[in-house]
Amino acid sequence: MQTGKVKWFNGEKGFGFIEVEGGEDVFVHFSAIQGDGFKTLEEGQEVSFEIVDGNRGPQAANVTKN
């Protein structure tokens, strides 16, 4: 599991990026967020996640809010 902070997330479009210390930003789609209800993230929020290879490069999977 990796940890990082949400750089930005657009709730209307359902995606954003997670900032990883010492690494490149990672794309995150709302479908990767674990939990019930409306799936969104707040800027600066700390999260844990796995990195998988997506269609456009690395992206976050199994995202949980810390």
From Swiss-Prot:
This is Cold shock-like protein CspD. Induction: Not induced by cold-shock. Keywords: Activator, Cytoplasm, DNA-binding, Transcription, Transcription regulation. InterPro entries: Cold_shock_CspA, Cold_shock_domain, CSD, CSD_CS, CSP_DNA-bd, NA-bd_OB-fold. It is found in: Cytoplasm. It comes from Bacillus cereus. Homodimer. Coiled coil: none annotated. The lineage of its organism: Bacteria, Bacillati, Bacillota, Bacilli, Bacillales. Its main location: cytoplasm. CDD domains: CSP_CDS. The gene is cspD.
